[in-house]
């Protein structure tokens, strides 16, 4: 929390950066290859509303442009649970997120809600629908992010969500490009059954390893040291 006003002033932001914003910025500074040096950069962010990851990427690119006297055109696309979908309101009432930056209202064509218009990445048809949009519009994504990782005691549902974001990011990522995904370690010592989920977790990490030339595990200094939160970065997707 102490960092937020400092960063707001340092980068002359018209908003206060969130914890998610700060953590992703730190990851990008640690592994700067994530953001290519092309003149045109395209990203897709899953589970993104209200837009903290995109705002963090935007600032990172802007600061790099200032440092190297370059000019980069940044185009983002995003996915999230659709706050205007009645299905979402009934199915996920606890996960609705407001349009803090008015990015949904001002850029409706940038938001990919999928085939059923819910934005639910646990529906495979929605992932396929996003892929079709990207392919049909000849969009070459430089980076795919996902902020869907959660911690909690509902292990089976969390595993389904983590698997969905893994499949989604891998499938949507362009060959030779990168992903960054928020995850949580599976073991919660207060929950006995969580120890049994380690096999699933290792298998999920192995899936990433099969699909990328390298994978990195990083825990930002700005992340709660007592939490199992970490970020997985997939470097150069293989042609799979």
Model-assigned labels for residue ranges:
Residues 41, 142, 213:
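Conserved acidic residues
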Residues 227-232:
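Short hydrophobic/aromatic beta-strand or adjacent loop that forms the aromatic wall/cage
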Residues 233-240:
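Flexible, glycine-/basic-rich loop-and-beta segments that form/coincide
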Residues 45-46, 210, 225:
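Conserved P-loop NTPase motor core
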Residues 154-216:
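Conserved Class I SAM-dependent methyltransferase catalytic core
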Residues 46-51, 81-82, 149, 184-188, ...:
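An acidic- and aromatic-residue-enriched active-site/binding cleft used to recognize and process polar
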Residues 44-50, 133-154, 182:
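Conserved proline-anchored active-site loop of SAM-dependent methyltransferases
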Residues 1-137:
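Intrinsically disordered, low-complexity glycine/charged-rich regulatory or linker segments
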């Amino acid at each position: 929390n102490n960092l937020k006003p400092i960063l707001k002033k340092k980068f002359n932001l018209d908003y206060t950066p969130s914890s998610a914003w700060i953590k992703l910025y730190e990851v990008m500074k640690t592994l700067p290859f994530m953001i290519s040096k092309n003149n045109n950069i395209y990203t897709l962010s899953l589970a993104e509303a209200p837009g903290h990851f995109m705002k963090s990427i935007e600032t990172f690119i802007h600061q790099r442009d200032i440092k190297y006297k370059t000019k980069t055109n940044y185009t983002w696309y995003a996915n999230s649970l659709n706050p205007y979908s009645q299905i979402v309101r009934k199915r996920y009432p606890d996960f609705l997120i407001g349009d803090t930056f008015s990015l949904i209202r001002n850029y409706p064509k940038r938001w990919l809600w999928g085939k059923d218009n819910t934005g639910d990445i646990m529906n495979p048809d929605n992932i396929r629908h996003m892929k079709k949009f990207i392919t049909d519009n000849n969009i070459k994504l430089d980076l795919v992010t996902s902020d869907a990782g959660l911690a909690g005691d509902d292990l089976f549902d969390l595993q389904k969500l983590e698997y969905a974001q893994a499949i989604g990011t891998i499938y949507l990522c362009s060959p030779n490009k990168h992903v960054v995904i928020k995850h949580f370690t599976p073991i919660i010592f207060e929950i006995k059954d969580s120890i049994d989920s380690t096999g699933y977790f290792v298998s999920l990490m192995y899936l990433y390893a099969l699909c990328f030339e390298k994978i990195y595990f990083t825990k930002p200094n700005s992340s709660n040291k007592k939490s199992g939160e970490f970020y997985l970065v997939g470097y150069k997707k293989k042609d799979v």
